[in-house]
Amino acid sequence: MIDPKLLRNNIEAVNLALAKRGVQLDPTEWASLEVRRKELQSKTESLQAERNAGAKQVGQIKKAGGDASEIMTRMQAIGDEIKAAEVALAELQAEIEQKALSIPNLPDESVPEGKDENDNVEISKWGTPRQFDFEIKDHTDLGEWMGGLEFETATKLTGSRFSVLKGPLARLQRALTQFMLDTHTLKNGYTEAYVPYLVNADSLRGTGQLPKFEEDLFKLQGEKEYYLIPTAEVPVTNFVRDEIIDAERLPLKYAAHTPCFRSEAGSYGRDTRGLIRQHQFDKVEMVQIVKPEDSMQALEELTGHAEGILQALGLPYRKILLCGGDMGFGSTKTYDLEVWVPSQNTYREISSCSNMGDFQARRMMARYRTDQKKTELVHTLNGSGLAVGRTLLAVMENYQRADGAIEVPEVLRPYMGGATYID
């Protein structure tokens, strides 16, 4: 959530920043809400002052032996008016908060203008796509030929956009996960975390999925309001909800491996073949909690950690700076990493790394205690390090051989019992 003071006092600056997203707020509406809020707050405070003065007057009259019944009757009426004014003020503040929760984060000044992915800016490329001297297969054909990737079985078990991995491919996915976690925890300084795969609505409000994106979530039926996590970002970032952290503890850095569950609402007909777009997929997520002045440098570091995984695996990729119109709801700046997929002859997203600024922290009331003993909002960051299923398909396609076997990248061989290939 963006700073309410900006909405109250500088809506023009908010709209100027949101223009990069193609979003504009109605200044008249927000001015009207602020006028009503001030009127109700002033009325409430005035009535409270009148009640306090009346109580003092009653005490003086009774002390003098006089009759204070008339004033006491008026005070009772004032009490009823105060209750009504407080209810009206609370309802208005709830309305303002709900409207504020639907406003996306303000893009950083360095974010380019643009409407969609066509306006994103390529920052760099790493690696050279392999030139094959045989007719290549996509990962779906490779997996089915090996007998280790089954979509029909998953459809029978659950439905479309699910998959079953068996044998060497299942082991390769586990190897990728272990390699990612080992790299982030042993080399990059993250603390490993395993978290619940079900979260409550407060957690999803904290990270920004609710209330705006409920249709993208899987919600459980029953008495308790639980949702399947769309990413480990949700539970891990909420570690600091309603907390005040000592400054010397920052930054906090966590890495978590979880399945992720997404309804993929609005993606009907897109990427229906293979592992690109699934309702359930594994991901290793990185989360950092930092001081405000450190967050932009932390974004570069976190993105570099995701790049390091791709480089260690020898997978060609490119780094993209997202334009305002393509950024996620809660982000102030985002880099996407796109891996080369030979069968599609293009790059596809494999990691998204975002600085959320204080947007999530304000929703969560996540603060830290400064050296001056004041409390300020932390900044939060998150990034995929990496999406495991998409990394698996990238390894399968980029490391395939003419005989259908798949070479095992050197860094994964210790996790594969020394195997140099699988078939």
Swiss-Prot record:
Keywords, in A-Z order:
Aminoacyl-tRNA synthetase, ATP-binding, Cytoplasm, Ligase, Nucleotide-binding, Protein biosynthesis
**Chief localization:** cytoplasm
Q: In which pathway does it act?
A: Aminoacyl-tRNA biosynthesis; selenocysteinyl-tRNA(Sec) biosynthesis; L-seryl-tRNA(Sec) from L-serine and tRNA(Sec): step 1/1
Query: Where located?
Result: Cytoplasm
A GO molecular function held by the record? serine-tRNA ligase activity
**Which transformation does this protein catalyse, written as a reaction?**
tRNA(Ser) + L-serine + ATP = L-seryl-tRNA(Ser) + AMP + diphosphate + H(+); tRNA(Sec) + L-serine + ATP = L-seryl-tRNA(Sec) + AMP + diphosphate + H(+)
**Alphabetized Pfam families for the sequence:** Seryl_tRNA_N, tRNA-synt_2b
Enzyme Commission (EC) number: 6.1.1.11
User: Record-annotated residues binding ATP?
Assistant: 262-264, 349-352
User: Where, if anywhere, are coiled coils annotated?
Assistant: none
What domain of life does the native source organism fall in?
Bacteria
Oligomer and partners: Homodimer. The tRNA molecule binds across the dimer.
Q: Which HAMAP family match?
A: Ser_tRNA_synth_type1
Name the PANTHER family for this protein.
Answer: SERINE--TRNA LIGASE, SERYL-TRNA SYNTHETASE
| Membership in a protein family | Belongs to the class-II aminoacyl-tRNA synthetase family. Type-1 seryl-tRNA synthetase subfamily.
Protein name in the entry: Serine--tRNA ligase
- Native source species: Acinetobacter baylyi (strain ATCC 33305 / BD413 / ADP1)
Q: Which gene encodes it?
A: serS
